[in-house]
């Protein structure tokens, strides 16, 4: 899978999910906290730059292997 760069559109810590806007202008991608790589509490902040891969999930495309940049 190709690595894609993008920016966090929004992320709800209490629900553990949000959306990332890819930098190539394609459709926003769902992200679940379990796909965030790193130690400690897994969360994202609005406007944060990230790198990720896209995988087809049960409800459409989802971001996986999400790394903060």
From Swiss-Prot:
Locations listed in the record: Cytoplasm
Pfam families: CSD
Domain of life: Bacteria
Keyword Transcription: yes
Keyword annotations from UniProtKB, A to Z: Activator, Cytoplasm, DNA-binding, Transcription, Transcription regulation
GO MF: DNA binding
GO CC annotations on file: cytosol
Alphabetical list of PROSITE patterns matching this protein: CSD_1, CSD_2
Domain CSD residue range list: 6-66
Database matches in NCBIfam families: PRK09507.1, PRK10943.1
Protein name: Cold shock-like protein CspC
């Amino acid at each position: 899978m190709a690595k894609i760069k993008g920016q966090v559109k929004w992320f709800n810590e209490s629900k553990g999910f949000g959306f990332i806007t890819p930098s190539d202008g394609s459709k926003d991608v769902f992200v679940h906290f379990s796909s965030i790589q790193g130690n400690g509490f897994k969360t994202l902040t609005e406007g944060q730059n990230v790198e990720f891969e896209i995988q087809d999930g049960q409800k459409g495309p989802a971001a996986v292997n999400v790394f903060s940049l």
